[in-house]
């Protein structure tokens, strides 16, 4: 009894234990292997928050809980002291109770940390919702501002159009006014011109009047001079008559004698005088008539000329007025055309500017919408994760609540010594359904092969077309015979050989499929962890209801589960590394090529040589079998290729011996490369299996070294493979056949361990598609150029024939990726059954 009294009298012993367990539990919970989904929560909230919360905020709660538990334990030990001492198992019971207290305190600490994390996540969710609301309000405000700006822009554009219309109207009015002013100016100029013309006509008439007056004066002067002359002649005549009369009077005798003559002279003078007067009158009359007639003619001519000039001037003025009106109309039409062109250019510029601005705004809105969609998707994913965490926490909280209720009922039964039947409390089943939508966006995969065949045949004929035709017929017959033999050989080979699948080209889709498989495995591991935690909670509940021995077993199981979790995490990391190395090994093992025959036929296009793809098998055995089959097929094809060539050599009997030796030397190189690939893949896969079993980092380093050696061996094989293509010149019967083959090999891309090999077969470059990190390759091109030159000469006829035949084949392969969606629906149903047992106390009285 002294032991129980000491323990009851010293409650600090009970208080000392929970503090130690609390510190130890906090250290244990800080380890990465323990805790409820500590890895998944490390992404959302830091672990420092939970640790600081445990140190600061949980101290009073833990003290209170430890005090309550210590009081309950003291009462329990005091009431059961006699029974336990009589039973002889007091130390074991105390140890089990201390372990239960440690367990409950640790669970309380975890529960408080989970509650704090839930509050923190709720606060983050509220902040995110506030940001989303602010963004939505901002977008709404932007939209309202845009509407307001659009309305203002429309109004301003309407006003601008009105102003432009008014401006055009004013411009048209000004043009019309300018036209009127121009018309008036022209009319004024015309009137001034008419005035000048009339003044000039007046001056001309005045000049004519002056001239006519001068002519009249001259004529008057002539008349006066003639009158003076007549008077002078009359006076002279009279003087002469007087002289004659005087002479007559002097000689009277003579006069007497000549009396009869006196009358004759006077009559003669009278007659002469009358004749002279008549002549002078006639001359005067004729001169006057001539002057009058001349004056009348001149006046008539002047009047006629004036009328013609006036009519011509009127016509000229009319034509000028018409020309001015037409020019004015033309200027007005030009002005309207220029204004319309300016308006059209302005409208086009405005339309282009508006279109560019609208396109910019549309692009900006699309970018914003895409960003908001991405943000919403991210928030939805985070919200889904938080919901999953919340459901798990609700389950654990319910489990802890039931545990606490069970402990309280046990304490109450032990303290009050209440007897009652055994009952079980069954918790209602909780069903968690989580839908994970997994999308892989890949473009539809299509293979489009474009082949462009150009065949150019040039023939130059010099002499004797008959001989050339005979030569051509013989050559064609030989070629037809050779092609028939080749076709027969090919048919036999096809019957013997099975269908062979060619080496695949690993596209970016395989990488995405591997990543999708890794994500599915990670999700499956998370679900397994949740199930393990549900099992832990069930075990904890059963441990709370069972007796002392079961609690020890539960603790051992929890420790073992923690160790298995740590081991599981290590195994997950190792499994990921194994997957990466296996993917690399499979990629390196898959990259082998099978030669494709290219029979040469007379005047026929080059046959196509597509690169066929085969899906890679994940299992190592299947890959090895495929590699062996590929080796066999390659050997058969090499033998088949060598056989027709050797037959041709036997027929023509002049082929050098070096060519078959070279081709035979090529085949062992390929066989060695294939054997090295197979041995390397076997060793790597065996070592990976050993690593997963033994879980030692040293062997992982060895695997990496082997992978590096493998990359080196692949480099050697890749270096050997291009040495197989060689140029051959064959001289047969004086004929020279020069075959030039152009080969294009794709550049090596990818990691340092992965290299791609290009195998040249029959002048074709069949190279596998390259793999890119981050970028999808969609185009593969194979270009083959073949030139055959033949010169035939015959000494007898002296005819030469020069034939050049060039064939170019271009092959283009386009690959597109496929889009598909995977929906993974995982439903988790957890049923928890808690059983509480009421233990009867037996007290023995002394």
Swiss-Prot record:
GO process annotations (BP): axo-dendritic transport; axon regeneration; cellular response to estradiol stimulus; cellular response to oxidative stress; cerebral cortex development; hippocampus development; intermediate filament bundle assembly; intermediate filament cytoskeleton organization
Modified how: There are a number of repeats of the tripeptide K-S-P, NFM is phosphorylated on a number of the serines in this motif. It is thought that phosphorylation of NFM results in the formation of interfilament cross bridges that are important in the maintenance of axonal caliber. Phosphorylation seems to play a major role in the functioning of the larger neurofilament polypeptides (NF-M and NF-H), the levels of phosphorylation being altered developmentally and coincidentally with a change in the neurofilament function.
Region spans: Disordered: 1-52, 483-783
Region (Coil 1B): 149-247
Domain IF rod: 100-411
Superkingdom of this protein's organism: Eukaryota
Listed SMART domains: Filament
Subcellular localization: Cytoplasm, Cytoskeleton; Cell projection, Axon
PROSITE patterns recorded: IF_ROD_1, IF_ROD_2
Residue stretches of biased makeup (Acidic residues): 489-499, 511-533, 554-575
Residues carrying Phosphoserine: 31, 98, 225, 345, 417, 429, 467, 483, 503, 507, 537, 545, 550-551, 604, 609, 643, 667, 687, 713, 721, 751, 767
Designated name of the protein: Neurofilament medium polypeptide
Organism of provenance: Rattus norvegicus (Rat)
């Amino acid at each position: 009894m002294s032991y129980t009294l000491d323990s009851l009298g010293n409650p600090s012993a009970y208080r000392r234990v929970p503090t130690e367990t609390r510190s130890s539990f906090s250290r244990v919970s800080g380890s990465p292997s323990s805790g409820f989904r500590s890895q998944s929560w490390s992404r959302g909230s830091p672990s420092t928050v939970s640790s600081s919360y445990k140190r600061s905020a949980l101290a009073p709660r833990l003290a209170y809980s430890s005090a309550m538990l210590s009081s309950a334990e003291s009462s329990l030990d005091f009431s059961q002291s006699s029974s336990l001492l009589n039973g002889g198992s007091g130390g074991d019971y105390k140890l089990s109770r201390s372990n239960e207290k440690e367990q409950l305190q640790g669970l309380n600490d975890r529960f408080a940390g989970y509650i704090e994390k839930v509050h923190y996540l709720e606060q983050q969710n509220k902040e995110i919702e506030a940001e989303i609301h602010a963004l939505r309000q901002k977008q709404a405000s932007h939209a309202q501002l845009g509407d307001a700006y659009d309305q203002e822009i429309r109004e301003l554009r309407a006003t601008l159009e009105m102003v432009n219309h008014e401006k055009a109207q004013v411009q048209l009015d000004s043009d019309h006014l300018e036209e009127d002013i121009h018309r008036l100016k022209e009319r004024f100029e015309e009137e001034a011109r008419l005035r000048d013309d009339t003044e000039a006509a007046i001056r001309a008439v005045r000049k004519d009047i002056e001239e006519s007056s001068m002519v009249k004066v001259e004529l008057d002067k002539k008349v006066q001079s003639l009158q003076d002359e007549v008077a002078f002649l009359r006076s002279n005549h009279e003087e002469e008559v007087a002289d004659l009369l005087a002479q007559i009077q002097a000689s009277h005798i003579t006069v007497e004698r000549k009396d009869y003559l006196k009358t004759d002279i006077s009559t003669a003078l009278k007659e002469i005088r009358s004749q002279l007067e008549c002549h002078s009158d006639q001359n005067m009359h004729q001169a006057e008539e001539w002057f009058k007639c001349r004056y009348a003619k001149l006046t008539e001519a002047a009047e006629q000329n004036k009328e013609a000039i006036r009519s011509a001037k009127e016509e000229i003025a009319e034509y000028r007025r018409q020309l001015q009106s037409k020019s004015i109309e033309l200027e007005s039409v030009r002005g309207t055309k220029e204004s319309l062109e300016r308006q059209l250019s302005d409208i086009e510029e405005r339309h282009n500017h508006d279109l560019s601005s609208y396109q910019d705004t549309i692009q900006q809105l699309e970018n914003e919408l895409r960003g908001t969609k991405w943000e919403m998707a991210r928030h939805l994913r985070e919200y889904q994760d938080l919901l999953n965490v919340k459901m798990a926490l609700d389950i654990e909280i319910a489990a802890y609540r039931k545990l606490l209720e069970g402990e309280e009922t046990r304490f109450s039964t032990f303290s009050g010594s209440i007897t009652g039947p055994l009952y079980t409390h069954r918790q209602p089943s909780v069903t968690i359904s989580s839908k994970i939508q997994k999308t892989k966006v890949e473009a539809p995969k299509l293979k489009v092969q474009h082949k462009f065949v150009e065949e150019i045949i040039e023939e130059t004929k010099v002499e004797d077309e008959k001989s050339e035709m005979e030569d051509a017929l013989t050559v064609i017959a030989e070629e037809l015979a050779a092609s028939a033999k080749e076709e027969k050989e090919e048919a036999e080979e096809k019957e013997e050989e099975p269908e062979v699948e060619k080496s695949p080209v690993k596209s970016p889709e395989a990488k995405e499929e591997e990543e999708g498989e890794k994500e599915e495995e990670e999700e499956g591991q998370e679900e397994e962890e949740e199930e393990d935690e549900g099992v832990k909670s069930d075990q904890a509940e059963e441990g709370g209801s069972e007796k002392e021995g079961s609690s020890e077993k539960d603790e051992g199981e929890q420790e073992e589960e923690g160790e298995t979790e740590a081991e599981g995490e290590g195994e997950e990391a190792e499994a990921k590394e194994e997957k990466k190395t296996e993917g690399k090994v499979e990629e390196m093992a898959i990259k082998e090529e099978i030669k494709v025959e290219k029979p040469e036929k007379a005047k026929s296009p080059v046959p196509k040589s597509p690169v066929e793809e085969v899906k890679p098998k994940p299992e190592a055995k299947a890959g090895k079998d495929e590699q062996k089959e590929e080796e066999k097929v390659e050997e058969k094809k090499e033998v088949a290729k060598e056989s027709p060539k050797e037959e041709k050599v036997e027929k023509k009997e002049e082929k050098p011996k070096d060519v078959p030796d070279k081709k035979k030397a090529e085949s062992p190189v390929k066989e060695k490369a294939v054997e090295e690939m197979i041995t390397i893949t076997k060793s790597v896969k065996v070592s990976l299996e050993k690593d997963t079993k033994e879980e030692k980092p040293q062997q992982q380093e060895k695997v990496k070294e082997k992978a590096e050696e493998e990359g080196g061996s692949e480099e050697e094989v890749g270096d050997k493979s291009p040495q197989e293509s060689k140029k051959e010149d064959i001289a047969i019967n004086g004929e020279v056949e020069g075959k030039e083959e152009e080969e294009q090999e794709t550049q090596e891309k990818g990691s340092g361990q992965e290299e791609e090999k290009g195998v040249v077969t029959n002048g074709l470059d069949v190279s596998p598609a390259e793999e890119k990190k981050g970028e999808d390759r969609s185009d593969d091109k194979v270009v083959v150029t073949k030139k055959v030159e033949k010169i035939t000469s015959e000494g007898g006829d002296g005819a030469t024939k020069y034939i050049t035949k060039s064939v170019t084949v271009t092959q283009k392969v386009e690959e597109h990726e496929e889009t598909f969606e995977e929906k993974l629906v995982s439903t988790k149903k957890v049923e928890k059954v808690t059983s509480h047992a009421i233990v009867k106390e037996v007290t023995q009285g002394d």
